[in-house]
Amino acid sequence: MARFRLLLVNEFKLFRTAIPIHLVAIFQPTVMYLLMAAILVHPTFDMYVDKSATEEGRALVAAMEEVGSPIGLPYINPILVDWDGESVSRQVIAVGEQGGALTAVQHYGLIDSNLVKNFRNRLTAAALRLWDAELGSRAVTVEESPWLPRDVPYTVYFGMALLPMTAFLAASIMGAILTAQEFEFGTIVEYTLAPASVVLVLGARLTRLVLSALISAGILLVAVGLTTGFWPGSLWRVALILLPVTVIAGCLGLLAGLLMRRSIPAFLVGLVGSFVGWILGSGFGLAAGFGKLYEAISRLTPFTHATQLLFAQYYGAGIGRPVASVFFLLVTATVMLVLTGLAYRWRVMRQG
């Protein structure tokens, strides 16, 4: 135990050999989240409406104010403006007579087709309320049946899905850099001659990587909680879910460092693996919402399984098959541990 403690202390001292990498690994995901949260889609859209003197125009604005989630925020924030009929930044609605009929014309600026769809759908929802009032018994009633008891903003999901990537990124790139540096600085010989067993050496390094990765994820978790007001139901369960993810990532970093023996290539393995896995692993939405092919591919990554397990902690509702996800994470972590042990024995003995 004393030998393991000395190895662990030495692992943390290695922070001084790659300070920029450690800072990037620990803080970059949180900084990215805070920047992205400022531009991510918000359910309430500011929609500009040209001031209308007609009763119908005022009725449309009133209907727009009624459009919203039955359990959360409104979908439209109508803003009355004096439109000159020419310049449009995003969109503006002008109510006027065309062909003898009162018409609401939605003018668009330079925006993408997805934003056009969002603006159009909100205007249609407001118009439907006007039609229903006129149609009486023939009205088309549209009811939203929420799955959850309250609306959860997308920034919560984005931050939640970023937690596995945060832990993975920190463990993988730190493990890759530290291990590759052992070869670049020639200190790998010390491990070859050391009386400590492979289990102690790898155990100390993985413990350090796991703790560092959990700290990085913890910083992001606090940032998500402070900015959204949403906190997980159980912090220790979140840590348990992320634990096998950090082990898998740490082993990937160690393998990259052992096999490549160069800092930059090993670092790129961890970096690319983290971002590709995050994108393919439900990073922007639940895998089932992107088609069967994407869902099948995403289940090959630890990110989707971790995200599905984290979902219950943030939303209070379970999705997927939790037992299968836990099994996948544990088996993958075990396989990676075995491969890392074999690679370490082969590479260190060969170096000696």
Where does each model-flagged region fall?
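Transmembrane helix segments
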Residues: 33-44, 260-300
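Long, hydrophobic alpha-helical segments
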Residues: 155-177
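Junction motif at the cytosolic side of a transmembrane helix
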Residues: 9, 15, 41-43, 259, ...
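Alpha-helical transmembrane segments and their short interhelical loops
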Residues: 198-271, 275-278, 320-326, 330-341
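Transmembrane helix-loop junction
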Residues: 37-38, 177, 181, 224-225, ...
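Transmembrane helix boundary and interhelical loop/hinge segments in multi-pass membrane proteins
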Residues: 15, 172-194
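Extracytoplasmic/periplasmic domains immediately adjacent to an N-terminal transmembrane anchor
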Residues: 1-155
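Membrane-interfacial helix-loop-helix junctions in multi-pass membrane proteins
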Residues: 148-152, 281-338, 346-347
